Swiss-Prot record:
The lineage of its organism: Bacteria, Pseudomonadati, Pseudomonadota, Gammaproteobacteria, Enterobacterales. Forms a cylinder of 14 subunits composed of two heptameric rings stacked back-to-back. Interacts with the co-chaperonin GroES. It comes from the Bacteria. It comes from Serratia ficaria. Its EC number is 5.6.1.7. It catalyses: ATP + H2O + a folded polypeptide = ADP + phosphate + an unfolded polypeptide. It is found in: Cytoplasm. This is Chaperonin GroEL. The gene is groEL.
Amino acid sequence: MAAKDVKFGNDARVKMLRGVNVLADAVKVTLGPKGRNVVLDKSFGAPTITKDGVSVAREIELEDKFENMGAQMVKEVASKANDAAGDGTTTATVLAQSIITEGLKAVAAGMNPMDLKRGIDKAVVAAVEELKKLSVPCSDSKAIAQVGTISANSDETVGKLIAEAMEKVGKEGVITVEEGTGLQDELDVVEGMQFDRGYLSPYFINKPETGSVELESPFILLADKKISNIRELLPVLEAVAKAGKPLLIVAEDVEGEALATLVVNTMRGIVKVAAVKAPGFGDRRKAMLQDIATLTAGTVISEEIGLELEKATLEDLGQAKRVVINKDTTIIIDGVGDEATIQGRVTQIRQQIEEATSDYDREKLQERVAKLAGGVAVIKVGAATEVEMKEKKARVEDALHATRAAVEEGVVAGGGVALIRVAGKIAGLKGDNEDQNVGIKVALRAMESPLRQIVINAGEEASVIANNVKAGEGSYGYNAYSEEYGDMIAMGILDPTKVTRSALQYAASVAGLMITTECMVTDLPKADAPDLXGAGGMGG
C-alpha cells in the first residue's frame, strides 16, 4: 500500500479552502447577464467556449492533492445541482464558496464546527420553506419564455423556441436539442407516436417524391412474433381487403414468403400494406407494443396470452388517422385509443419511473410517457461555427432544464433577489446555542452572495446595490442587464424555484461537511525511479 500524506486542523482547512477558491473563482465569472465566458482547452480539436458553470467545474483538476480535494468537493455541488434541476450550477458554487469561507473563519475563531453545521442546516430548512411560499406557478407561455431566456443568458430567441415547443407537445412531451445545419434555430414538431423503425421493403413506398409510405386511416396489426408464413396472415388480409382500408403490420419481424406476398399484393394494388419491425428489444419491445395498442385501441397478438395470428379479427386491430413511414422512422398520428385508457397507461409508466434505479431506464420510460401523452419536438440549433454551435447547444439544453423545473415547482424573482428576501424573512431565527447562531448568520450572509456576484460581474459596487435591494420588498431588485432597479417579475427576470432550492440545499450540504473536516489523507507522490544511465552492456 502506498505511503500517505496526512494534514490536520488548520493546515488541512487552509489547503482545502485554496482549492475551493480556485474552482469557485473560475466558475463564478460566468454568473449573471454580464457574466464572461471561460475557454476550455481540449486535447484534440478546437477549444470549447462556455458560460455553463458545471462544464467549467468538470474541467478543473489541481496539482496539489489537498487543494484538489477541496475543488472536487465543490465540483460535487455543481454536479448535484445540475442533476437535480439541470441549471443553477454557478449559483450553487457561489453559495458553497461563501458558506465555506465564512464557516472556516468561524472555526478558526474557536467555534464548534458541528454546531456551526447544525446552524447552517437549520437556516437552510427554514429558507426552503420560505422559498416555497414565495413561489408563483409558471403555466403561461410568456413566463416559460422568460425563464428560458434568462437561463440561455438573455437569448430571447431560445426562450421563445422552448415556450413554443412546450405549447405544441405539452408539459410532458419530449423536447430534444440537436445540432442544426443552417444559421437559424429551427423547431420541428412530430405529433403522434414516433419510433425508430422504418419500412421493411422499399416496395411499400407510395410517395416516391418523399421516399415514404403514407397510409390514411389504416388498420394496425400488432404481433409479438416473427411472421414468415403467409398462411398466418391470410384471414386478416382478407378482412382488411373487404373493409377497403390499408394495413400496417408491426411485428418482431416479417420475412421470407410473408414479406414477398405482402410486397406483391401492394404492387398489384390488391391491398395496401406496409410492414415495420416493432421498436425496442426483449421486455421493452413487449411494453412498447402494448403502448401502441393502447394508443390505437388494438390488441397485441401474442402467443404468451393465448392469441394466435390466424384467429385475429378486425376487432383485434388498432386504428389511427394516419401513418407515415420512411427509411428509419414510423409515426402513428391520432390513434383512436380511449383517452382514459391512455391516461391509465401513462400513470402506470410514471409509477415505473419512480421505481426505476438506472438513469437509462428512467430516460426510456420518460420517452414512452411523452410518446403517449404529447409528441416530440426537436429544437435544431443554428450557428456559424462548430465552436459557437457547441456553446449554444449547451445553453439551449440548460434553458430547457430550467423551464421544465419552472413548470414543476413554479418561479421566484430572479437575479438573486429571492434568496435575499428569504434571508430577510428568517433573520430572527435562533439556534440552541451561540455557535449555532453563528452558523445561521453564515448561511444568511451566503444567501446574498449570488446577487453580489451578479453585480460584480456587471462591474458595479456590490455592497451598495445589495443594501438597496435589501431595503426594498417583494420582487424589487436590480436588473444587471439594463442596470436599473425595479420589479424583477414584471421585468421578466425569473428563476425556477427548484433551481434556487437545489442550489441552496446542495451548497449547504457539501459546505457543512467541509467545515467539519479536521483531517485530510492523500497518497504521497511517488518518487521517480532513478534512471539506469551508464549501466554497462553485455560483454562481447
